[in-house]
């Protein structure tokens, strides 16, 4: 059982590395056009669903606050994000990073590239197989979040 689990872990590690390498390669031209790094692109992706604080981004990226602050400053300078203060009922020291129209435009282009890649890679798989993989990944993702919140 342990050996079998180790094989799965090694496979997942290689899979994640392959996905990251492909993503970096396919997004390189777009990132160059917007003059941002892969890490800055990842921050924009995090902000796609909701505004976040620097602390929240730091936690999700697993790097130090200074590195995230530098990324955010560059994104602000590039007019891809802006700082927003919350309403008066919330701690005024909190500043939320939100996407600008230019940041949303970048993500729209990025998502189009990623959709094309996903379609090319999965075009010979039936929708049931894809849905089954997604369901398993959602269970694993939920467990990762639960595990992470308890450690």
Swiss-Prot record:
PANTHER family: HTH-TYPE TRANSCRIPTIONAL REPRESSOR YETL, TRANSCRIPTIONAL REGULATOR, MARR FAMILY. The keyword Cytoplasm does not apply. Gene3D superfamilies: Winged helix-like DNA-binding domain superfamily/Winged helix DNA-binding domain. GO terms for biological process: response to stress. Keywords: DNA-binding, Repressor, Transcription, Transcription regulation. Disruption phenotype: Cells display a 5-fold increase of the ica transcription but has no significant effect on the adherence ability nor on the amount of poly-N-acetylglucosamine polysaccharide (PNAG) produced with respect to the wild-type strain. Double deletion of icaR and tcaR increases ica transcription about 500-fold, and poly-N-acetylglucosamine polysaccharide (PNAG) synthesis about 100-fold. Adherence is significantly greater than that of the single icaR mutant. CDD domains: HTH_ARSR. InterPro entries: ArsR-like_HTH (IPR011991), HTH_MarR-typ (IPR000835), MarR/SlyA-like (IPR039422), WH-like_DNA-bd_sf (IPR036388), WH_DNA-bd_sf (IPR036390). The keyword Transcription regulation applies. The gene is tcaR. GO terms for molecular function: DNA binding; DNA-binding transcription factor activity. It comes from the Bacteria. Residues 54-77 bind DNA. This is HTH-type transcriptional regulator TcaR. Involved in the antibiotic teicoplanin susceptibility. Inactivation of the tcaRAB operon leads to teicoplanin resistance. It holds the Pfam family MarR_2. Residues 1-142 form the HTH marR-type domain.
